[in-house]
Amino acid sequence: MKNARQGKRQQEIDLNTRKRTKSIEIDYNSITLNNFERLINNNKKNRNYMEIKVSSSQFNYTYGNRIHLPYSIALLVSYIKTKEKFSQFRFEKTFVFRNEEKIEGYVEQCRDSDILLCSCYVWNWEITTLLAKKIREVNPKCLIVFGGPQVPEILEDFFEKYPFVDILVHGEGEIIFENILSEYLKERNYLKIKGISTKDFTTEPQERIKDFDSMPSPYLTNTVLDLVDNVDGYQWIASWETNRGCPYQCTFCDWGSSTATTMRKWSEERLYKEIEWFGDNKIPYIDGCDANFGIYRDRDFQIAKKLREEKLTKGFPETFMVNWAKVSSEKIIPLAKELTSVGLLKAVTLSLQSLDKNTLDTIKRANLKFNTFSNLTTSFRDENIPTYTELIMGLPGETLESFKKGLETILSDEDLGSILIFNCGLLPNAPMNYPEYREKHKIKSIRTPIFLIHTRKDEISIQEYERIVIETSSYNLKQLKEMYRYAWMIQTFHTFGILELIAKFYQNEYKLPQMEFYETLLQYGRNEKSFFSKEFDFLEKHVDKGYSGKGWAHYDFDLAEINLPLEEASAARFLRLDTNILFTEIEKFVEFLENKKEFHSKSEILSDLIKFQIFLLTTREHLEEIKEEKFVYDWKDYFVNNSAITKSKVKYFYKNKITEKDPIKWIWDVVWYGRKEIKYKMYPKLLQVDSLVINKIVHKLY
């Protein structure tokens, strides 16, 4: 029977008569490394049979000199190792480094493996299937098991395309893997096991794990380190869950659908010990895997407090990357302050995805009201905590006009930090990918090389792919390309600050909507030869290449040896310009705008404004510790207090955010590491003022 999930499920499984193997009763919450090792050694003493060799893979990309530990595999292994009945299973090192040259070595190591366990994600599917295929060729008897988010629930022709895979694991893998190994030791009738698919059948889903404290920690048992070899020059990233589940059902995401709405938590005692483990083992980066950190406000505050204490005591962890609760409020500010006070947190995410009501209804998402959102960004700004928001282009229900309207609304929030805008990815198990949903909204997608920002080109020898949406009933491909152009302009010229205050000036003085300002910039970039137009040429090629399925990678080795998003690369090219050249380029565009809109601003005002805009940017030319500049007009008063333009010979100064002398490191610090922390510009309200002449004269534009 093929893909029984799409038809009737197996009904003949009699759960009442199912045989269960008795195992040792253990208090996993009190497990330490020493008694875990004693337990394993005791299990080994009971062996009087041949070992079963288990190999595994959880491939990841490197980010700088960092790579993720194989957390998912370690969860399974640490659990299995506590079961006496599985003492004959010998777990080999997990393959994590992705390199085509290493594949043959991995295959050779698996020539005599009995089981291959593969943790599958969108960023490692191709290399994982290549590994499994090659191992099947040299080791036909190996049981190959795939699990992870990339394992599809809707199988279609999966086993025809990947005949070398024996078992697919759906959902949480701990209990399912235990049952697979139990059956492996017996008659190997996998039909008895819930939550799996083979080429012949799919069984009913496995119930969710209710008691997480029955699962030992892969960190406290040191399992996660036992599964890897340390490599000189590399540091480990630790994935970390404090809870599992998501109460939301956004259709573009597989989080809520894959873990259901029930939220389940690990004990605070275990989490605090894991935080201490991170510090003891000098783990620099914690990749938080919660869908909604902060949803348990008091509990999560104590977790944040413990992380802060650990960093102050031991210097590690250095960074905690976390997905914040979708419906945030000022109540999470104390959590964020604990983390930002010691540099653990770079910025708080306040995601919107879309501001269009019809789109939000279509994707089953509810946002904060925008005035509430805006008040929240102001509260964070008052506490000196950076914020950023995320938008998705091309969601079902969105139109070009609604997308532009949403951007106009977001730009009205002057306290919001960065704006990050992404294509709409189509995940295999997200509700958006269900056949009935795709048909209802006329969703078309393409397979394209995966866009993994800040990864090295030399890791792309085995190309990974993703699916992105390129058309729905609410927009066509041409309109989506236009959305991308506006997304790039807003991120490059507004968020990175190249033209931000110029746009606000024209909005204040001429009531020119900011999106109309950027529409004019688009016309200028398309028709006028300038340094700006060179970036627009990059943009057009990038858009055509991306939406034809050839990928979104953008490499400029004058900037960095990594894949930069186009908006980061464009901003970097502007910010490293000689400031006189940048002044001239902005001046040319302003002249074009004035002529196009028939504005007649005074040249002295415009020159001083452009000078002020550039002064606020983190430019490569100026690496001094303190930046200072004299101006004819009081621009701080104008932008911060909405005052009239007044002449006042004034000098502003501020501490330079980036003074790195190495040109490549400078770019990384400004547009990569510094993007969410707003390291690329200074806000007018934070300027220090040294008044030379307190003689203000209200100055008219005309």
Enumerate the language-model features and the residues they cover.
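Glycine- and acidic-residue-enriched helix-capping/strand-helix junction motifs
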Residues: 62-74
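Radical SAM enzyme core and accessory elements
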Residues: 2-59, 64, 86-88, 109, ...
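Short helix-loop-beta junction
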Residues: 75-89
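Radical SAM [4Fe-4S] cluster-binding motif and immediate context
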Residues: 42, 218-382, 393
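Conserved C-terminal portion of the radical SAM core fold
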Residues: 115-117, 279-289, 315, 319-323, ...
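N-terminal [4Fe-4S]-dependent radical SAM core
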Residues: 5, 18, 23, 28-53, ...
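Glycine-rich beta-alpha loop elements in corrinoid/cobalamin-binding modules
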Residues: 89-209
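Hydrophobic positions in alpha-helices of CheY-like receiver
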Residues: 80, 134-135, 307, 380, ...
